[in-house]
Amino acid sequence: MQITIDTQGDRRTVTLHGNLDATTAPEVEVRMDTAGLRELVIDFTDCPFISSAGIRTILVAHRRMAASGGTLVARNLSPAVREIFDLTGLSKVIALAKTAREISVDGCELLSSGVCGECFRLDDETVVKLYKDGVHISMAEQEKTYAKAAFVLGIPTAISYDVVTCGTRSGIVFELLNAELFSAAIRRDPQLIDTHAKRLADLAASLHTAKGDAEVLPQLKDRIRDYIHQLGDAFSPAEISLLLERLDAIPDADTCVHFDLHTSNIMVQDGELVIIDMGDFSIGSNMFDIGLIYMIYGVPELGICELATKIDTATGVEFWKSFEKHYFAHRPPEERAIFEANRHFLSALRITCAIVYLPHMRDQFIRQVREILLPRIQAESRGSSA
């Protein structure tokens, strides 16, 4: 039995890989810590069988959640597991999440392809973002929730519809009328690179002034810390300690942060920029976004720019230089100082976290962090303590 845990604030998703029976139930019960949770989701996508011992484990977790005023939800039950839930009456006790709608993208226009997924145009009014194989459906459900929160805050984001599946992949459908990918617009008119960069800088500045709803949005620093703690098989205790130390040094904030803000997650609709990817929308320091943008466009040796945006590396570097100039032009000087002291650490965070949830990129990201970014982070740490 393999157990995957994803904690987002007071919501935790526990994904079971294997049978939940007398052999595995004790470990599952230990791992399903309910303290401080408002919602505990148990995902049965890869769990083909549950025994009476497994049922008792689920009931124990349900009682704990109920006693603290929380909710336990079971989702993605196979027909065999659903039958067991029905026969035992468990389906009348435990909340069951509805099954996502199945779609096909055969013949659909591919708008963009990146590290996490692909965007397809379904029709003149809607697009779907499909996550890569191996990315859990909870990511799509989370994105829908955060997209709605951003829309309410007035952040220019596409209207989200429903969570869907396409074969073994999951995704989310958005409304977008006659829109073009921002990366495509940049590739078409690279001579306007400074103008394009200023548009992203203005969008980022606007997003970073919005106050986040703590009832809906998680604290990004807490999420990052949780991911780092799961990297014991990839990095040494000293390296993990260093990453956590650098994370704690980044100031807290009560404003919004996107954590995947780049030109292939933005569409141009009627001349306005509209964000289409809100899966990591959170509350936290704007430095997390600036580090992500720097990683994609300003660190050419990583090769992320062409992978994520199809913009050539040299153009990406010019884009970063212009973005940096425009973004920090109207920010407090201390923000620029924080970024300069932590730029390599901040640039490493996105791919460091992705080691946990993007299995198809795991080896590459570990190598890039270890060989390229960690030595620079260590140098930053020595500089800050000097």
Question: Where do the model's predicted regions map?
Answer:
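ATP/Mg2+ or Mg2+-diphosphate-binding catalytic cores
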Residues: L349-A386
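Catalytic activation segment of kinase domains across protein kinase-like and atypical kinase folds
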Residues: M267-I290
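Active-site activation/catalytic loop segments of kinase-like enzymes and analogous catalytic loops
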Residues: I290-R331, L346-R362
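ATP-binding pocket architecture of kinase catalytic cores
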Residues: E109-E215, P251
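Juxta-kinase regulatory segment immediately upstream of eukaryotic protein kinase catalytic domains
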Residues: A100-D106
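Amphipathic alpha-helical interaction surfaces in cytosolic regulatory modules
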Residues: A22-V93
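Short beta-strand/loop segment at the start of cytosolic alpha/beta domains
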Residues: M1-T15
